[in-house]
């Protein structure tokens, strides 16, 4: 006998940037309980599902989510009452139907996702299973290689480089626990290196440092120095990953790199990345080009797609229609997975499966405005995604995910595999 949804209650809570977001509690007919809170992004893709905000300037500068909360507590609550909690696909289809818009503008992706995830958590509790096992009851699981965002620029930090995120990936680790240790040691090493340069060591939205560096290359150089000072070998133990968030640099058909006084065409931007990949131990570039620069993406993939993971975030917005086009046109070789870009768990899982079936990687990701919710850690393990991007090893809303992964690895024991370089399916 499968438990049914008895009640759902949503509320407005705060995210890690001090902005309101939606949290939902679900209780099933057998008393099982599930809770989920949704994150929110700073640099958002224009094709993302709609995050419903109140727009009432007298509360939270217009960012309140009373409308989304009310949607959960009224129309969604009555629609899902008595619904079989284990039928996730059916539940998500019902939410999509109830919303009835192509981009979830009526109910809000934040209202829908809070519901979708809270029901999944409750259904897992009903079966006395951790969420990752409920989503995929397997004999063996792959723990993700973490992407640690240790140096911030762009929209995540107000006084730094053109590019948004400079990350390290401990590809040479033997376990997730060791990867976390390596990433954390490099993070502390970077702090010392920056202090030695009389640089600011305050942290950005995702826990990375936000120094004032003269050029974008200086950011990479300072990280390479930090890796070595921590006792690791760049390009063997630890690789660099980038998220320049290039849509933020694009205007009128050109890419503007303000710190370098450069304005580049699409083909020149591709050559710029090719030069960086030649020079530095870079294993992954996310959103290296504007979200609608399809020709540029195809050119970049033709040139370096066999040696670097090219991840689409704003480019695909976890949307299978855009992803399907990307696969057909060979426009990248990886997708970033953000639950709140699409708004339901089932659609998120469908995007991961579509990427994997094409031989692409799927990187499960947080947002810059996070909560203490750890669903993405379980999702990464359940889907054997092999990679997770959830900030620096600093700030509790980031470390909550890493700590959840430590517990999962411990719980799985010999059934947990850390993939290292095997996580990058398409690299020669």
From Swiss-Prot:
Record field: catalytic activity: (2R)-2-phosphoglycerate = phosphoenolpyruvate + H2O
Main location: cytoplasm
GO biological-process terms attached to the record: glycolytic process
Annotated binding of Mg(2+), by residue: 243, 286, 313
Residues annotated as binding (2R)-2-phosphoglycerate: 164, 338, 367-368, 389
Pathway: Carbohydrate degradation; glycolysis; pyruvate from D-glyceraldehyde 3-phosphate: step 4/5
The record's free-text note on cofactor binding: Binds a second Mg(2+) ion via substrate during catalysis.
Family: Belongs to the enolase family.
Name recorded for this polypeptide: Enolase
UniProt source species: Dehalococcoides mccartyi (strain CBDB1)
This protein's encoding gene: eno
